[in-house]
Amino acid sequence: MRIEKCWFCSSNIYQGHGTIYVRNDAKVFRFCRPKCRKLFARRVNPRKVKWTKISRKMANKELCNDAILTFEHRLNEPRMYDRAEAERTLSSIPRILEIRKRREDFFIKDRILTGQEMNKESDLKYIERHANLLEEEVAGEKQVAKAKKREAQTN
């Protein structure tokens, strides 16, 4: 069974699903849902729509340029059937999926950690810029503490 890709959002299109638009120059466009077809008809650029795969890759929210992703590429040239090669391929699929999952998880975790580091840096810069506010607050707390000590000594 051949699984096609949506021209607009790059999601999977299984057999019996989606629509096909063939232009006058015989260029074929496959769409997974009417939303993608309508955006294509309005000539919306998929890179500027936040939920498409290409825009997520451009914003570094998805893993790209990784060797593990080359296994998914579609080959347009017919190959001679070899039973041994087919068995090796089928037996290696779980291992490939495991490696891919591990790399994607690491990519997401790394992205989150770098975001947290950037937030910490911006918070520290904010504190440095507004240090006078903290000094006023600390001074007020010291005065309150001194007043409590005086009351305790007089009692």
UniProtKB/Swiss-Prot annotation:
<dbReference type="Pfam" id="PF01246">
    <property type="entry name" value="Ribosomal_L24e"/>
</dbReference>
<dbReference type="InterPro" id="IPR000988">
    <property type="entry name" value="Ribosomal_eL24-rel_N"/>
</dbReference>
<protein>
    <recommendedName>
        <fullName>Probable ribosome biogenesis protein RLP24</fullName>
    </recommendedName>
</protein>
<dbReference type="InterPro" id="IPR038630">
    <property type="entry name" value="L24e/L24_sf"/>
</dbReference>
<dbReference type="GO" id="GO:0003735">
    <property type="term" value="F:structural constituent of ribosome"/>
</dbReference>
<dbReference type="InterPro" id="IPR056366">
    <property type="entry name" value="Ribosomal_eL24"/>
</dbReference>
<dbReference type="InterPro" id="IPR011017">
    <property type="entry name" value="TRASH_dom"/>
</dbReference>
<dbReference type="GO" id="GO:0005730">
    <property type="term" value="C:nucleolus"/>
</dbReference>
<comment type="similarity">
    <text>Belongs to the eukaryotic ribosomal protein eL24 family.</text>
</comment>
<keyword id="KW-0690">Ribosome biogenesis</keyword>
<dbReference type="GO" id="GO:0042273">
    <property type="term" value="P:ribosomal large subunit biogenesis"/>
</dbReference>
